[in-house]
UniProtKB/Swiss-Prot annotation:
This is Flagellar transcriptional regulator FlhC. Heterohexamer composed of two FlhC and four FlhD subunits. Each FlhC binds a FlhD dimer, forming a heterotrimer, and a hexamer assembles by dimerization of two heterotrimers. It comes from the Bacteria. One of its GO terms (molecular function) is zinc ion binding. The keyword Glycosyltransferase does not apply. It holds the Pfam family FlhC. Keywords: Activator, Bacterial flagellum biogenesis, Cytoplasm, DNA-binding, Metal-binding, Transcription, Transcription regulation, Zinc. The lineage of its organism: Bacteria, Pseudomonadati, Pseudomonadota, Betaproteobacteria, Nitrosomonadales. It comes from Gallionella capsiferriformans (strain ES-2) (Gallionella ferruginea capsiferriformans (strain ES-2)). Functions in complex with FlhD as a master transcriptional regulator that regulates transcription of several flagellar and non-flagellar operons by binding to their promoter region. Activates expression of class 2 flagellar genes, including fliA, which is a flagellum-specific sigma factor that turns on the class 3 genes. Also regulates genes whose products function in a variety of physiological pathways. The keyword RNA-binding does not apply.
Amino acid sequence: MAIKTVLGEAQQIKIATDLIVLGARLQVLQEETSLSRERLLKLYKEVRGESPSKGMLPYSTDWFISWQPNIHSSLFMGIYQFMIKNAGVDGVHALISAYRLYLDQVQGIEGGEVVLSITRAWFLVRFFKAGMMQLITCRECSGKFVTHTNELHNNYVCGICHPPARAGKTNAKARLLAGHAE
């Protein structure tokens, strides 16, 4: 049985609080901290002012492959791997730091829309660790993009270099353009 310390518990509460602020689901908190479900529920209500959402987690590797999610997932994964390799952080600390940097990048763009939630980012990291997904280099721009591990990747071209026909035709973009027209 592990001996609990006040400092250790404070660190677990800090991790849980950071994840809650970023929008993590309760199941993520349970996996990444040693706090009890009851403590996490109480902390969640204290931080967010509401109970955590219920239901199944978004578990699918296919979501990360579609056009816009792939761009955002690839950006996040590039940041995450950079943090692991160069910043001396790992585990949940790398997830939190990389996700905050991802938010800074996306929200720094006019009309930038956050597509990747912290929960999906957490799953993406798990999929990479399980060998289900990988980064592959685009032959046109040399950027690295998220793909399934067992797919053929000869002459891979990313969704930025070769966007789908309806790419960028979102309601958010239409609202943004309407705002500039006024």
